[in-house]
Swiss-Prot record:
Keywords: Antibiotic, Antimicrobial, Cytolysis, Ion transport, Membrane, Secreted, Target cell membrane, Target membrane, Toxin, Transmembrane, Transport. It comes from the Eukaryota. This is Im-1. Expressed by the venom gland. It comes from Isometrus maculatus. Signal peptide: none annotated. Belongs to the non-disulfide-bridged peptide (NDBP) superfamily. Long chain multifunctional peptide (group 2) family.
Length: 56
């Protein structure tokens, strides 16, 4: 087990197409969420994108 290999694997994973897609989607979601919070105050986000909450 080597950290060097793990780092290389993580880098490969980070630069993969899937990861890039997830990152851009995540970034868009965060931006939209922040915009909604600023413009609408305490209103909940749309049901199409449920907020991520810890299970109770």
């Amino acid at each position: 087990f080597s950290f060097k290999r793990l780092k290389g694997f993580a880098k490969k994973l980070w630069n993969s197409k899937l990861a890039r897609k997830i990152r851009t989607k995540g970034l868009k979601y965060v931006k939209n969420f922040a915009k909604d919070m600023l413009s609408e105050g305490e209103e909940a986000p749309p049901a199409a994108e449920p907020p991520v909450e810890a299970p109770q």
